[in-house]
Amino acid sequence: MAQIICRDLTIGYEGKTVVQNINLSVKKGDYLCVIGENGAGKSTFMKTLLGLLPPVSGKIEFYDGLKKNEIGYLPQQTEVQKDFPASVREIVLSGCQNHLGFWPFYRTKEKKYAEDMMKKLQITHLSKRCYRELSGGQQQRVLLARALCATRKILLLDEPVSGLDSQMTEEMYRLIEKINREDKITIIMISHDIRGAMEYASHILQIGQKVIFESKENYLRAYTKRSVLGNTGGKK
């Protein structure tokens, strides 16, 4: 079942068109890796999906009962975020805000769900620690737990391994893959680490002057063919 469909979508910001003619269908349980050069429009695409930026033209359609405020989002970290003076538990619990409606306090079910997500991400022992005292890998686990509190259906991850060393990067990829496989949560992830990110992906969206949306197998087959033709002097 499709969760998100983009039809002839053109995206941009401040009156500037960045990417044109994005057509894709993301189904429940897909793992979509979004790739492209710096400044190609990857983060603009993600912000448009979230409703933080309006489409220039075209449509984004949500299915499977999905609402914009039910999408878990892990943005790129900034230095301000890294120095945020709150406890791990407070940050994870804040991911439940969209479920409160007009209720002014966190209820037992939100608190339990936050505890469950901390357990899943293996950060329960850090719950009383100040976020800014944590390592980069621990901080990313906290933010991922927070994003999971916002959704049971789909996660949007913008450079989730940025600034992590190779060991922490691999741990984060395995964790995201486990969430996708075991919990059937759809993943849409931006990453500059193309090789590492694509290892677990089911689909690839390449954003740039040319937009390509394919299954990983078809994308890699076409990429290999282009490389062979280029190396043998064939037509590109």
Ranges and model annotations:
Residues 58-69:
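Conserved ABC transporter NBD signature motif
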Residues 155-158:
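Catalytic Walker B motif of ABC-type/P-loop ATPase nucleotide-binding domains
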Residues 202-216:
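H-loop (His-switch) and adjacent beta-strand-loop-beta switch element
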Residues 130-134, 138:
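Conserved ABC ATPase signature
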